Amino acid sequence: MPKKPAQSDSTEQSVSFESSLSELESIVTRLESGELPLEDALNEFERGVQLARQGQQKLQQAEQRVQILLNDSADDAALTPFTPDAE
């Protein structure tokens, strides 16, 4: 009998960037309130780190997709590498 993927794996993949960001903002608010017991705060922090990493990965994937689409464009315009700190 084939193994089913872990529930958390399939859940993580199906969660949208926006819902992850919303959950992360909620976690930050609860942590900043200072009212959580230590164990709960650590659990929330751990989940927040996980969400932040997932969000960063999704953003990187989106950036790569945009670069691929722009590189495949017919006008062959020169692209400047994306630098998030540039203004």
From Swiss-Prot:
Citing just one GO molecular function, the answer is: exodeoxyribonuclease VII activity
For this protein, the Enzyme Commission number is: 3.1.11.6
Localization per record:
Cytoplasm
Keyword Cytoplasm (UniProt) = yes
What does the UniProt keyword field contain?
Cytoplasm, Exonuclease, Hydrolase, Nuclease
* HAMAP family named among the record's database cross-references: Exonuc_7_S
Checking PANTHER family in the record gives:
EXODEOXYRIBONUCLEASE 7 SMALL SUBUNIT
Q: Which family does it belong to?
A: Belongs to the XseB family.
Q: How does it assemble?
A: Heterooligomer composed of large and small subunits.
Question: What is the protein name for this chain?
Answer: Exodeoxyribonuclease 7 small subunit
Give the organism, scientific name.
Serratia proteamaculans (strain 568)
Instruction: State which gene encodes it.
Output: xseB
